[in-house]
UniProtKB/Swiss-Prot annotation:
Gene Ontology MF term list: 4 iron, 4 sulfur cluster binding; ATP binding; metal ion binding; nitrogenase activity
Lineage, opening ranks: Bacteria, Pseudomonadati, Pseudomonadota, Alphaproteobacteria, Hyphomicrobiales
Name of the protein: Nitrogenase iron protein
Post-translational modification ADP-ribosylarginine, affected residues: R102
Keywords attached to this entry: 4Fe-4S, ADP-ribosylation, ATP-binding, Iron, Iron-sulfur, Metal-binding, Nitrogen fixation, Nucleotide-binding, Oxidoreductase
PANTHER family for this protein: LIGHT-INDEPENDENT PROTOCHLOROPHYLLIDE REDUCTASE IRON-SULFUR ATP-BINDING PROTEIN
EC number(s) on file: 1.18.6.1
Gene from which the chain derives: nifH
Family stated for the protein in its record: Belongs to the NifH/BchL/ChlL family.
Binding site for [4Fe-4S] cluster: C99, C133
Length: 299
């Protein structure tokens, strides 16, 4: 266990968190690291590209079939994927029933008790980040994940979620050893995206670990249920993920305690960058449009 790096990828739904994490981990395994992935997202897609398969059976669904978690063996839930990466999905309940975070808690305890954490260099948690409720905060709260990487973009909701996740990290940073490893910007090609990502990282007392450019090759690889590292190892995008993996690898012990900002400060930042408009600007634009329309109608 000495030297075990427990990292987690958080980010809002649909941000490309699972894609980014799996490509990063595929690049890390190429560097000779032994890896265990624990998927903590109810979608159970945190290991799909590593296993080249549809979503794997989750600990919760297998436990329900077997009777209880105690009735499971480690080999029932742990699958081996690309270059020996160990994969587990914790799963979640039926929509509208129970707490999705409960599966995370149940899974991590089961894995630890059954020796899944032995003989690995990295344990990576892939966690839904829109809701920092008790269950999803579990890897942070229980002092499991030590380094949190927030996957975000220049879109307002992604920035909002990143700031919220930073609040969750701050809450547990003093009682446990959890730190913010940094932000990973998954390019959405919004205005001034790199500047905004770097500015937010600075405000959060952190760093932008890497800016991942947008490339359709990611979708081509996903359709084949593969990471870009496996599908197109010589591509420019694979090189980007390798750079990201190298930066994560060299970032051990360099995490910080975040300084989240208020909603007002976040909105002010978006205004300063011209991403968001004031009500006056919006009204002026609307008035200009109406005037142009009226002028066109006259002619």
């Amino acid at each position: 266990m000495a030297g075990l790096r427990q990292i987690a990828f958080y980010g809002k739904g649909g941000i490309g968190k699972s894609t980014t994490s799996q490509n990063t981990l595929a690049a890390l395994v190429e560097m000779g690291q032994k890896i265990l992935i624990v998927g903590c997202d109810p979608k159970a897609d945190s290991t799909r590209l590593i296993l080249n398969a549809k979503a794997q059976d989750t600990v919760l669904s297998l436990a329900a079939e077997a009777g209880s978690v105690e009735d499971l063996e480690l080999e029932d839930v742990l699958k081996i994927g690309y270059r020996g990466i160990k994969c587990v999905e914790s799963g979640g309940p039926e929509p509208g029933v129970g707490c999705a975070g409960r599966g995370v808690i149940t899974s991590i305890n089961f894995l630890e008790e059954n020796g899944a954490y032995e003989d690995v260099d990295y344990v990576s948690y892939d966690v839904l980040g829109d809701v920092v409720c008790g269950g999803f905060a579990m890897p942070i709260r229980e002092n499991k994940a030590q380094e949190i990487y927030i996957v975000m973009s220049g879109e307002m909701m992604a920035l909002y979620a990143a700031n919220n996740i930073a609040k969750g990290i701050l809450k547990y940073a003093h009682s446990g050893g959890v730190r913010l490893g940094g932000l990973i910007c998954n390019e959405r090609q919004t205005d001034r995206e790199l500047d905004l990502a770097e500015a937010l990282a600075k405000r959060l007392n952190s760093q932008l670990i890497h800016f991942v450019p947008r490339d359709n090759i990611v979708q081509h690889a996903e359709l084949r249920r593969q990471t870009v590292i496996e599908y197109a190892p010589a591509s420019a995008q694979a090189a980007e993920y390798r750079k990201l993996a190298q930066k994560v690898h060299e970032n051990g012990g360099k995490g910080t305690i975040p300084t989240p900002i208020t909603m007002e400060e976040l909105e002010q930042m978006l205004l300063d960058f011209g991403i968001m408009k004031t009500e006056e600007q919006q009204l002026a634009e609307l008035a200009a449009k109406e005037a142009a329309k009226a002028a066109a109608a006259v002619h």
